[in-house]
């Protein structure tokens, strides 16, 4: 197949994926990835699907195919991890996930799943780690990020334990999820095919709730209970892995257990540090000048190179070193605190709390506004939005800070939206 034919075959699917708030810049590498994951027919059909959740009847109408045939196609795509499907109010609902966090990861969460995973690993590495456009927009395209850091709860002392909200705790996500699934770490699995993987645990990628339900159903993840989930969390923390999860308060879909050498989020944090590509915790480690002996263990375990060693300024020992934190780089994960053998580090609250979006819809609207794609989120030309769906989006917008509301209004160029955002016209639209 020539490059021109390939591009023509998958351009429409690429255009569809680029409508997600985090985007998916169309490049030759993306077309090659899509060719591995989708047949030509699948690509043409998926390109027509809406971004919002849909049922079989909606897909059948869009495709102009019988419902039975449409259901079979949708279930095949779900079995490949290219769609998510779940039961919602006794109805089977399908969702087209974004490339990340989405079907890129799903394609590598199960060993030997029918894909050429070595080829995918090579393509993903080039698209994410060599080319810059996609990963930069994914992690640093605006103020609101796709993922956030969870604090290592064992690094908290008795004082700051009381200030941690439930949604800031990975343990709370595990205890309250309706479903929990475990799959292979996409990042380390990818690096394994490139002979670049570290020795951190592989079978430790955590998915939750509806996402886990679908991945478990189709064999991309194995179901685990709370006890095993907590055991795996402890195992991850023993290996100094950082808990990086979906940047929402409610119904978290995933928590990755990240190393600093393989994982996309940590690599992005180092690559685009000044752009704050990952939402931090509400904590920062403080170095005790008295207790720190300059051993450097905190430097070695920091996944984003926020810790360094500098001269301790000891007039009696010119070689003595002490740890110094670069607060602008620090995620506040607490890995360094647990690694210190001298108890020379302690987590303290940041001066300003980090705001976490409440729901996926809330985060998606913020990301879309900041990345200039709100019109794509609302006016998805394949989706027939009902009043309830539109009201939910508008309800999120009307709860945003004034600056974000102005950005939304400018993007939409909507007199109706501008009228709604006048203080006297504020209404509660979500119910």
Where are these regions (language model features)?
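Long, low-complexity, charged/polar intrinsically disordered regions in eukaryotic proteins
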Residues: 1-31
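Short acidic, hydrophobic short linear motifs in intrinsically disordered regions
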Residues: 52-63
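Short amphipathic alpha-helical interaction segments
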Residues: 63-79
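A short, conserved structural fragment
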Residues: 78-89, 307-308, 345-346
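Short, amphipathic alpha-helical interaction segments positioned at domain boundaries
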Residues: 91-131, 373
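Ferredoxin-like iron-sulfur electron-transfer modules
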Residues: 94-96, 242-254, 272-301, 305-332, ...
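Catalytic cores of enzyme domains
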Residues: 130-284, 316
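Flanking helices and flexible, charged tails adjoining ferredoxin-like Fe-S electron-transfer domains
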Residues: 318-322, 326-431
């Amino acid at each position: 197949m020539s490059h021109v034919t390939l591009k023509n075959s998958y351009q429409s699917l690429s255009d569809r994926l680029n409508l997600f708030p985090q985007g998916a810049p169309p490049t030759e590498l993306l077309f090659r990835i899509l060719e591995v994951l989708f047949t030509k027919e699948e690509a043409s059909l998926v390109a027509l699907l809406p971004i919002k959740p849909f049922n079989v009847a909606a897909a059948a109408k869009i495709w102009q195919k019988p419902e039975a045939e449409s259901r079979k196609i949708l279930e095949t795509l779900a079995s490949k991890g290219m769609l998510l499907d779940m039961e919602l109010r006794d109805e089977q609902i399908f969702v087209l996930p974004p490339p990340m966090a989405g079907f890129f990861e799903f394609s590598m969460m199960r060993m030997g799943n029918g894909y050429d995973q070595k080829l995918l690993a090579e393509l993903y590495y080039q698209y994410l780690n060599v080319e810059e456009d996609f990963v930069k927009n994914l992690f640093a395209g605006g103020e609101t990020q796709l993922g956030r850091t969870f604090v290592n709860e064992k690094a908290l002392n008795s004082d700051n334990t009381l200030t941690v909200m439930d949604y800031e705790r990975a343990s709370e996500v595990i205890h309250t999820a309706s479903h929990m699934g475990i799959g292979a770490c996409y990042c380390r699995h990818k690096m394994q095919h490139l002979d670049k993987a570290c020795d951190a645990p592989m079978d430790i990628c955590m998915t939750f709730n509806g996402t886990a339900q679908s991945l478990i159903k189709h064999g991309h993840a194995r179901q685990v209970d709370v006890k095993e989930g907590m055991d795996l969390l402890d195992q991850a923390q023993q290996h100094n892995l950082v808990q990086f999860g979906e940047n929402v308060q409610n119904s978290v879909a995933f928590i990755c257990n990240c190393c600093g050498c393989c994982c996309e989020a940590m690599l992005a944090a180092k690559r685009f540090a000044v752009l704050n590509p990952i939402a931090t915790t509400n904590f920062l480690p403080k170095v005790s000048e008295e207790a720190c002996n300059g051993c450097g263990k905190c430097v070695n375990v920091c996944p984003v190179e926020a810790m360094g060693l500098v001269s301790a300024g000891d007039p009696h020992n010119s070689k003595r070193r002490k740890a110094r934190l670069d607060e602008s780089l620090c995620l506040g994960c607490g890995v360094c605190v647990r690694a210190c053998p001298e108890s020379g580090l302690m987590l303290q609250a940041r001066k300003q709390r980090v705001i976490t979006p409440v729901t996926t819809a809330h985060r998606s609207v913020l990301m879309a506004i900041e990345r200039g794609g709100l019109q794509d989120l609302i006016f998805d030309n394949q989706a027939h939005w009902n009043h309830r769906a539109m009201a939910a989006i508008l309800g999120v917008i009307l709860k945003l800070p004034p600056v974000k509301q102005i950005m939304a209004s400018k993007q939409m160029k909507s007199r109706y939206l501008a009228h709604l955002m006048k203080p006297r016209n504020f209404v509660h639209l979500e119910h």
